[in-house]
Amino acid sequence: MRIGISCHSTAGGSGILATELGIALAKRGHTIHFVTTEPLFRLRGFYANIFCHTVNLVPYPLFRHLPFTLALSTKMFEVAKEHDIELWHVHYAIPYAACAVIAREMMPKDQRFHIVTTLHGTDITLVGRDPSFEPVITFSIERSNGVTAVSESLKRDTYEHFPVKREIRVIPNFVCVDQYPQAPDP
């Protein structure tokens, strides 16, 4: 399968989780295309079926702030079209799921990819509590083909604070214990 993944590229939990998931999927034979703002903190080494695309943020005098969401949506669209992406996995409803929805809508109808959104705490418990973000978070969740949350409490909070009807599946964060062997007990 040809899979796009978008996440924060920094050392935070969602970026680590998304990168490790991409590596695991690549090891199973899938082709992974990461779209991020900078090289992934966690991606070390070379994988023949992992590709990284960076979002080009061009300063534009009219805008006070760089139009990140527009640039991200465009890059997702370009990668999806050029590489025939079948599934896009995004970490965070905003901005990533919202941008994936825009990118998918730009695609010809017969080439539209599925979107899986993984919700993390900031989506729901911090940024999501601001009423100005509720409509776009709800829209992005509802327009996703699948939605996961990293904990039962996050799933409950999502249903409590957003008028979401889509099923949310809990997939807890994981750590590959083989990468971190325990020292023997003294």
Task: Label every PLM stretch briefly.
Residues 1-3:
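Extreme N-terminal starter segment of soluble prokaryotic enzymes
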Residues 72, 85-112:
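An aromatic- and histidine-rich active-site surface loop
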Residues 8, 119-122, 172-173:
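Histidine-centered beta-alpha loop that forms part of the nucleotide-sugar donor binding/catalytic region
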Residues 153, 174:
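Carbohydrate-associated surface elements
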Residues 13-21, 132:
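Conserved alpha-helical elements of sugar-nucleotide-dependent glycosyltransferases
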Residues 71, 108-116, 122-142, 156, ...:
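Nucleotide-sugar donor phosphate/pyrophosphate-binding loop at the beta->alpha transition
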Residues 142-152:
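A short beta-strand/loop micro-motif in the catalytic core of glycosyltransferases
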Residues 5-11, 23-68:
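N-terminal strand-loop element at the rim of the active site
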